[in-house]
Amino acid sequence: MDNIQQLKQWIDGSDRIVFFGGAGVSTESGIPDFRSVDGLYNQKYDYPPETILSHSFFMAHPEEYYKFHRDKLVVDGAKPNRAHLRLAELEREGKLQPVITQNIDGLHQAAGSKNVLELHGSIHRCYCMRCGRPYPAERVNHGTGVPHCDCGGIIRPDIVFYEECLDDDVVSKAVHYIREAEVLIVGGTSLAVYPAAGLLNYYRGSKLVLINRSATPYDDQANLIIHEKIGEVFAQV
């Protein structure tokens, strides 16, 4: 039995599956990832992307941040790929519990997934930093300059910048689901970003599946490793 057949067997036999995904899940939808050879961290800007995506940079240089945001984070026309669609289908079948994602693109919801835990927020939600008023993402993602609220405060995307903490409620839910999972499928992530990657340490089962095109720090703990494109894998299960 090859690895994809083994994964299919585990999926067919379980109704406590949890999926934990990163940027590689969306690259087949045309959204660049961060750490691959051709990802955002290897492209050249006036500042490194990890600097631009920090809280302190946003506060000091909101104009520069929004140039990057509109140029690189907003990908018009991106559609869910085979991985997003199959995961939504597994949820409808009562097999998949939540999708836990590090992505901010909203493609899991676009595919039909209802139970999505967004560790790093979403570019599809925005709010005023002064009064908290929510704003439609369209105003931020396709506007010009730095968007301001009627109260004068800066409108920011509801994403987690570097130097900021993850949402406690989202993290506690993710920990609960991972602890209770029978099958934990981890896909499209280098597992290099903490604290998100550390969530895998809460898994207590014996069916940890890693789907990634390159090695990860957790390979020695995995029960099944598949080095293929994640969309191609999910098209077969």
What are these regions (language model features)?
Residues M1-V237:
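Conserved catalytic core of sirtuin-type NAD+-dependent deacylases
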